[in-house]
Protein backbone atom coordinates (compact mmCIF):
# COMPACT_ATOMS: atom_id res chain seq x y z
CA UNK A 1 0.00 0.00 0.00
CA UNK A 2 2.80 2.42 0.83
CA UNK A 3 5.51 1.10 -1.51
CA UNK A 4 4.73 3.74 -4.11
CA UNK A 5 4.70 6.73 -1.76
CA UNK A 6 7.32 9.33 -2.64
CA UNK A 7 9.89 10.32 -0.04
CA UNK A 8 8.62 13.17 2.12
CA UNK A 9 10.28 15.34 4.72
CA UNK A 10 9.55 15.19 8.43
CA UNK A 11 7.56 18.43 8.13
CA UNK A 12 5.47 16.93 5.31
CA UNK A 13 4.92 13.82 7.43
CA UNK A 14 3.65 15.97 10.30
CA UNK A 15 1.31 17.83 7.94
CA UNK A 16 0.00 14.51 6.62
CA UNK A 17 -0.70 13.32 10.17
CA UNK A 18 -2.60 16.54 10.87
CA UNK A 19 -4.70 16.11 7.69
CA UNK A 20 -5.46 12.51 8.66
CA UNK A 21 -6.50 13.61 12.15
CA UNK A 22 -8.75 16.34 10.71
CA UNK A 23 -10.50 13.83 8.45
CA UNK A 24 -10.94 11.42 11.35
CA UNK A 25 -12.39 14.21 13.50
CA UNK A 26 -15.00 14.71 10.78
CA UNK A 27 -15.99 11.04 10.96
CA UNK A 28 -13.79 9.48 8.29
CA UNK A 29 -12.43 6.05 9.23
CA UNK A 30 -8.72 5.77 9.93
CA UNK A 31 -8.08 3.60 6.87
CA UNK A 32 -10.02 5.90 4.56
CA UNK A 33 -8.32 9.02 5.95
CA UNK A 34 -4.89 7.46 5.37
CA UNK A 35 -5.88 6.47 1.83
CA UNK A 36 -7.15 9.97 1.04
CA UNK A 37 -4.00 11.66 2.32
CA UNK A 38 -1.70 9.13 0.62
CA UNK A 39 -3.52 9.74 -2.67
CA UNK A 40 -3.10 13.50 -2.18
CA UNK A 41 0.63 13.09 -1.53
CA UNK A 42 1.02 10.95 -4.66
CA UNK A 43 -0.89 13.51 -6.75
CA UNK A 44 1.16 16.43 -5.40
CA UNK A 45 4.40 14.54 -6.08
CA UNK A 46 3.30 13.67 -9.63
CA UNK A 47 2.42 17.30 -10.30
CA UNK A 48 5.84 18.43 -9.04
CA UNK A 49 7.56 15.84 -11.25
CA UNK A 50 5.69 17.05 -14.34
CA UNK A 51 6.57 20.64 -13.52
CA UNK A 52 10.28 19.87 -13.30
Curated annotation (Swiss-Prot):
Pfam families reported for this sequence: UPF0181
Highest taxon above the source species: Bacteria
Family: Belongs to the UPF0181 family.
Protein name: UPF0181 protein VPA0916
